[in-house]
Amino acid sequence: MEKKMNRPILKELSLEPYTPDISDVGEYLNDLEFKKVKTKYTKGEDWTAISFHGYGPHPLDILKPCVLKSSVKTEAKLQWTSLYGEDHMTPIFEILDRLPCDKERIRFMKLQAGKVIGRHTDKIDKDIGFDDGEIIRIHIPIQTNEQVIFTLYESPRDKIGTEYNLKTGHYYYTDVTKPHAVRNESEVDRIHLVADCFANQELRNLIL
């Protein structure tokens, strides 16, 4: 497979959206403690996360080895967190089961109402890519609305990006090695299910 495969910067996967009502999932998540995502492009507790599947048993174990000065040991194994057995998570398993691949980290990422994530890339995670065994990052909005805007830029030199509004229950590939930003102009916290998927041809076929 050619290394420099031409791929979109954002694409809705060729999967039927998850249409059952998942508002109960959002309400359940709103009551949980989230952990701050430490970055240079957000402030305070604006951007937070919890882990559903990762490198520790606790939902606040959101990091992986060798990323963001993580204290996670390199020998740490992937595992489900304590959210695994919660009844509210049943729709999440149904959503994830539609993705034809193995998963690395699976997190819920929250952007508070009225807050922004500044322009950045996710290149700090060296595993992200498109070839077999690399990480393809898939976003599935769980709680959002039309006033949440995701902006992607083709090049670091671009001053103006393309704006997207991602819909609840839809599956989106985002090339997070490209500059991107998010602004939540609504009065509701935005929560995305973010699945880091091990790339394979079947998954790529849903994107290309």
Residue ranges and their predicted role:
Residues 118-122, 129, 149-154, 185, ...:
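A short secondary-structure junction signal
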Residues 120, 148-150, 174-187, 194:
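Short beta-strand His + acidic residue motifs that chelate non-heme Fe in jelly-roll/DSBH
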Residues 5, 130, 161, 201-202:
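Catalytic phosphate/metal-binding cores of nucleic-acid and nucleotide-processing enzymes, i.e., regions
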Residues 136-141, 171-174, 187-205:
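A short hydrophobic beta-strand segment most commonly corresponding to one strand
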Residues 108-133:
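Conserved short histidine dyad/triad with adjacent acidic residue
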Residues 110-111, 130-148:
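Short, conserved beta-strand element in jelly-roll/cupin
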